[in-house]
Amino acid sequence: MEPRTLDNVASLAYFAPELVLIAAALLLVVWDLASPARLKLAGLVILSLAALACSGGLGAYFLATDAAPRALFHGLLAFDRFSNLFRVIFALVTGAIVLFLVPPRAPGIEPELRRDSGELFTLILVLSLGMNLMAASRHLLLIYLSLELVSVISFVLAGFKINDAKSSEAALKYVIFGGVASGIMLYGMSWIFGITASMRLDECAARIAALTAQQGKVPEVVFVGTAFMLAGFGYKISAAPFHMWTPDVYEGAPTPVTAFLSVGPKAAGFAVLIRFFSDALGAGSAPPGVATPWPVLFGCLAMATMTVGNLSALEQENVKRMLAYSSIAHAGYMLLGFSVFSGAGVAAIAFYIVTYCFMNLGAFMVVMAVAEESGGDETFAAFRGLGRRAPLVAAAMAVFLVSLTGLPPTAGFIGKFYLFSALLAAGGAWSWVIAVVGVLNSVISLFYYARLLRTMYLDRSDRTEPTPVRPLLGGTACALAIPTVLLGVYWGPVYDFVARSVSMLR
């Protein structure tokens, strides 16, 4: 059933979560200019958290009431369970990042936080707005504009430490790679528009289906245009070979920003990728019996991304850089769901995104806690003996590392189980090849995750005194470890909920 199309005025009620973020961003600017200096930072944090709570709460309300799908603003945006699910995810992730920046100290970014606090929190809220738009876009032009909104703000956040050479280098590399990927993606969109004469994804799907039925195969123009568009999507999710910016940007950016980039924009990239391929190139874009090239294309992309990420992570000495390559590998795991191009595959991707947010945010939070107490040291040496110096934080990190590896009883194991199950359920030799490569990559990842575990618990440190960890930072890390374990032993309701949220996609 096609969603009901609403005009601009009627759409505003369903656009309320984004309107809250827009109003809050404007209010933050006013507060930054007019508030007393001693109240400024606390007010910015409170206003940001309140706005995110309202935005995420509205998304949760729409999910709970199972509101009927709508096409907002004459078909530009989708209002459905999928977009509302990601509204909640983005609000939670952004709220966690705001908590990372709570006074009295924000690791790696304290001087900039005190000097440019208004700009920082405003940018974070607008970035959350852009991610919401990415997940809901059903029009090629809005996909491009929302992706660029997220990208431009990410550039600024990566270079927020203006007096730090690494941060400036990270921002410059991010801009260069982002600009090239953006141009290539826009070029691919022009091919899709040229062959379909439309920018709405549903109309593109109908036109592509007609051409595919007429020719008996997917038109070459559609394949080439989609391949160009994948450059832009691949850049956002750090898929090989568009991943080269990721290690330098993650290492050079302030750690709270790195934590955000590793989960927020990446999840948004997968959301818009799911939306585009489901609505424009899904089941309705080709008649029965006509083979499409997308499973093979995504299978190759997944294998390359997993392998590059895991092999590169093996030789890293900086934990933050290691986690950057780890995030590349996890993008490869999530791409496994696209290689089968089925409802089960999409549900597995969405569930893996939920679990990945918990374990990756938690891992970066522990890195921040360690760097905060070691003078900014983010290498393996700073983690020596952490199991004795800060046992709770080390235990939380152990949970995150086990989950990132994909071992039971953690959420990462269940996430990978559903991904591989969807892959093998598709059948065929190609699915088995991809599955074997995926399992081998999981084994490779065990080496560098286990290396950090060994460093924390078996290596001795010159420091024997307990490591003081900021209560909010350590407490939040331990709190994130709870759902990471809980979803490894009792995942059914969450998976069923996520699967229902993506079931309306083609």
Curated annotation (Swiss-Prot):
Keywords: Cell inner membrane, Cell membrane, Membrane, NAD, Quinone, Translocase, Transmembrane, Transmembrane helix, Transport, Ubiquinone. GO terms for molecular function: NADH dehydrogenase (ubiquinone) activity; NADH:ubiquinone reductase (non-electrogenic) activity; quinone binding. Coiled coil: none annotated. It catalyses: a quinone + NADH + 5 H(+)(in) = a quinol + NAD(+) + 4 H(+)(out). GO terms for biological process: ATP synthesis coupled electron transport. Its EC number is 7.1.1.-. GO terms for cellular component: plasma membrane. It is found in: Cell inner membrane. The chain crosses the membrane at residues 11-31, 44-64, 82-102, 117-137, 140-160, 175-195, 222-242, 254-274, 289-309, 323-345, 356-376, 394-414, 419-439, 472-492. It is a multi-pass membrane protein. It is an enzyme of class 7 (translocase). NDH-1 is composed of 14 different subunits. Subunits NuoA, H, J, K, L, M, N constitute the membrane sector of the complex. NDH-1 shuttles electrons from NADH, via FMN and iron-sulfur (Fe-S) centers, to quinones in the respiratory chain. The immediate electron acceptor for the enzyme in this species is believed to be ubiquinone. Couples the redox reaction to proton translocation (for every two electrons transferred, four hydrogen ions are translocated across the cytoplasmic membrane), and thus conserves the redox energy in a proton gradient. Belongs to the complex I subunit 2 family. HAMAP family: NDH1_NuoN_1. This is NADH-quinone oxidoreductase subunit N 2. The gene is nuoN2.
